[in-house]
């Protein structure tokens, strides 16, 4: 709905215009009025740690001249889409319900409960009264404009991933394993939509490949090639390699730059951690196998991309969170924009 009300898909300027308002609450803090992607957002008077914002937009309807009266619909869906996009673009939490923001962003009270709260897993995103600069608001506007300018299918693909990304944050207090897997789902969904990688024999698991190569020596070459062709069509192999190639291809060099007080994943560790994240998601999806104990502990996550255990490297929740943000942002700006007047 948010994309539709911009008038992008209408072929006539003969329209009804409906000035609409809604309220969103957030831990993000800024003042004034901002125009961002066909929407105005204005800070309202705040009486607590969570700030209210008035969202204003024009819910446009093209006149049909059919003799039937058109009824304005979709305000709830518009706010749902907007809260998710703002949450992603401003790296914060937006919601129609103030108590939801307070619950997600709450701090752990001393001596209460042994389970960590979401804010202990990721740094900055869930800070109360998180200051947002003018430049950050402008960047948010640029992102929203780019997203709204995509064709309908691309817009829905990206929006669905952003919704899943935000759902992952909300799941942190309930099930860290599911929250972690949800981030991997985001990457998988994008990979399946935008990558057409075709696996080759060298992609096959090394141990199985070596064992088969010994058997192949006893078979004629033509038969060997046919068998290899069947094996590399294995769906799991295809999905796994597509996932890896897509993510690596949408992570820029700046992602690996040094940051003070944070352990950043190295380029040589990245693919190993990525493969492990994919396997963790697979085990959770098929066997409900939870994350290893260390990855469920917030102290390993907040200020480090990766955790090393038994000579292996794993993404922490916050590390994987950074990867997903990077990939969603980069794929959004890599997609072609379509002009107004395009068909749905």
Model-identified regions with their sequence ranges:
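Charged, non-catalytic interaction/linker regions at domain boundaries
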Residues: 1-181, 185, 306-343
């Amino acid at each position: 709905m948010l994309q539709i009300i911009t008038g992008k898909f209408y072929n006539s300027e003969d329209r009804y215009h409906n000035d609409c308002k809604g309220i969103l609450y957030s831990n993000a803090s800024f003042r004034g009025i901002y125009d961002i992607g066909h929407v105005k957002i204005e800070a309202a008077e705040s009486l607590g740690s969570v700030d209210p914002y008035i969202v204003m937009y024009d819910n446009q309807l093209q006149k049909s001249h059919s003799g039937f009266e058109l009824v304005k619909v979709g305000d709830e869906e518009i706010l749902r889409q907007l809260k998710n996009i703002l949450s992603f673009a401003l790296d914060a939490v937006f919601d129609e319900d103030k108590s939801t923001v307070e619950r997600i962003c709450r701090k752990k009270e001393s001596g209460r409960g042994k389970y960590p709260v979401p804010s202990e897993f990721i740094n900055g995103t869930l800070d109360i009264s998180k200051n947002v600069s003018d430049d950050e608001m402008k960047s948010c506007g640029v992102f929203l404009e780019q997203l709204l300018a995509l064709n309908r299918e691309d817009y829905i693909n990206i929006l669905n991933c952003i919704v899943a990304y935000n759902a992952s944050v909300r799941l942190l207090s309930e099930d860290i394993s599911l929250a972690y897997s949800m981030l991997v789902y985001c990457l998988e969904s994008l990979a399946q939509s935008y990558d057409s990688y075709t696996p080759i024999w060298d992609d096959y698991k090394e141990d199985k490949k070596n064992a088969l190569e010994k058997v192949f020596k006893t078979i004629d070459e033509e038969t060997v090639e046919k068998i290899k062709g069947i094996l590399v069509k294995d769906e799991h192999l295809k999905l796994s390699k597509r996932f890896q190639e897509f993510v690596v291809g949408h992570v820029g060099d700046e992602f690996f730059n040094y940051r003070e007080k944070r352990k950043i994943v190295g380029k040589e560790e990245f693919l190993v951690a990525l493969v492990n994240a994919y396997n963790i998601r697979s085990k959770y999806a098929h066997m409900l196998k939870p994350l290893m104990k260390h990855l469920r502990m917030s102290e390993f996550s907040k200020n480090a991309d990766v955790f090393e255990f038994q000579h292996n490297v794993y993404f922490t929740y916050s590390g994987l969170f950074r990867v997903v943000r990077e990939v969603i942002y980069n794929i959004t700006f890599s997609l072609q924009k379509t002009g107004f007047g395009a068909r749905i």
